[in-house]
């Protein structure tokens, strides 16, 4: 009887010690699993090139967007060269064109209802046009203007920092700002923007990746590689990827860059 009792005590003691070891091990395993599947880790996607099309010659692309008829609106930069252009992606033919004053360096563009907004780089001036490229309004903002897109009842603007600025689409008054982060770190040099289904797709100056951003939080949810586009002929340091236009009714985009001679029709995969 004594031997059986001692055996029982020894077994219970062993089981208690095993439990004390197992619990923290399980906890550590759970923590490790949570870290490896962090909800803040972005998707890593790429583009598939479907087609190419001509771009108006010598265009220092600052903004690109599809109009209601499938033509493309193009905003270009450089002092004395800045323009607002409507052209056919099928032929490259310029259908409509407006030259900015030589004192203005054109930047990002977007459509809002029947209007077109165009930013300027250092003058802090936003220009609004009607569908015939007649200027109907001019508004001012602080800092530089880089990229612009229309998201539901607001315009979203970049200024070369890690900040998205939420602007009133009628007055261009600033409503709020959001800092863009990739896994907790700020994403600087945000450039051309395209708003699609509540997300913002952004070029980053000097980068060959496109970032998909939640505009309300600033979180980058996808990093999209454009390595499938052959950029070997674009050798000037200024010839960077810059220009994103969603093709309505599809999951496709037109992409281009500064001084590029072609558009690339792509699908994100």
Sequence positions of predicted segments:
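Beta-strand-rich domains and repeat architectures in extracellular enzymes and scaffolds
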Residues: 50-83, 98-99, 103-110
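Conserved beta-strand positions in repeat-built beta-propeller and related beta-rich domains
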Residues: 72-78, 111, 116-123, 157-161, ...
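Signature of short aromatic-glycine-proline-rich micro-motifs recurring in repeat-based ectodomains
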Residues: 61, 190, 236-245
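Short loop/turn segments that connect beta-strands within beta-propeller blades
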Residues: 88-92, 130-134, 169-172, 214-218, ...
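Bacterial signal peptide processing site
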Residues: 32-34
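C-terminal motif of bacterial Sec signal peptides marking the signal peptidase cleavage site
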Residues: 28-30
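Surface loop/turn motifs at the tips and blade-to-blade linkers of beta-strand repeat domains
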Residues: 52-57, 98-102, 137-142, 179-185, ...
């Amino acid at each position: 009887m004594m031997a059986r009792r001692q055996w029982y005590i020894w077994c219970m003691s062993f089981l208690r010690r095993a439990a004390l070891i197992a619990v923290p091990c399980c906890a550590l395993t759970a923590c490790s699993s949570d870290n490896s599947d962090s909800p803040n880790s972005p998707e890593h996607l790429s583009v598939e090139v479907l087609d190419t099309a001509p771009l108006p010659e010598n265009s220092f692309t600052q903004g690109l967007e599809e109009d209601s008829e499938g033509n493309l609106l193009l905003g270009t930069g450089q002092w004395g060269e800045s323009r607002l252009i409507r052209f056919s992606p099928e032929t490259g033919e310029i259908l409509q064109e407006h030259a900015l004053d030589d004192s203005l360096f054109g930047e990002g563009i977007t459509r809002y209802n029947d209007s077109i907004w165009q930013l300027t780089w250092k003058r802090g001036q936003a220009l609004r046009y009607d569908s015939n490229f007649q200027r109907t309004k001019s508004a001012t903002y602080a800092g530089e203007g880089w990229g612009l897109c229309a998201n539901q009842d607001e315009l979203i603007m970049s200024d070369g920092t890690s900040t998205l600025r939420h602007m009133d689409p009628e007055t261009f008054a600033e409503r709020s700002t959001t800092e863009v982060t990739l896994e907790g770190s700020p994403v600087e040099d945000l450039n051309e923007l395209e708003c699609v289904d509540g997300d913002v797709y952004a070029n980053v100056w000097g980068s060959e990746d496109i970032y998909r951003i939640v505009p309300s939080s600033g979180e980058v949810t996808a990093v999209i590689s454009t390595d499938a586009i052959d950029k070997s002929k674009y050798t000037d340091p200024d010839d960077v990827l810059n220009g994103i236009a969603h093709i309505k009714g599809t999951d496709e985009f037109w992409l281009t860059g500064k001084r590029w001679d072609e558009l690339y029709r792509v699908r994100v995969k």
